[in-house]
């Protein structure tokens, strides 16, 4: 299976368990890796035969900027489901970064990574 990756998609969301996270919001970063067969698109040099990653990026940002959820795990699941709706995408790996998570000790990043496939 081939891979198309989008790294470092950035969007502001109001996700989190604490009221301050919901009120103020924070920046989330998202990395996605789409699993699909790119051979038909490559053979014909035809965008219509592959995933349009610009559209996927816009949809992912819309999820992050959309309805708030408590857990990063839930956000990752919603992003995965949006990606799997694209024809030809058989698998997706989603990594959501929450670099400003409310943690009381020094840290670089918090991430949740999930892998989902078509059933």
UniProtKB/Swiss-Prot annotation:
This is Dihydroneopterin aldolase. It catalyses: 7,8-dihydroneopterin = 6-hydroxymethyl-7,8-dihydropterin + glycolaldehyde. The keyword Lyase applies. Belongs to the DHNA family. Catalyzes the conversion of 7,8-dihydroneopterin to 6-hydroxymethyl-7,8-dihydropterin. One of its GO terms (cellular component) is cytoplasm. The gene is folB. The keyword Repressor does not apply. It holds the Pfam family FolB.
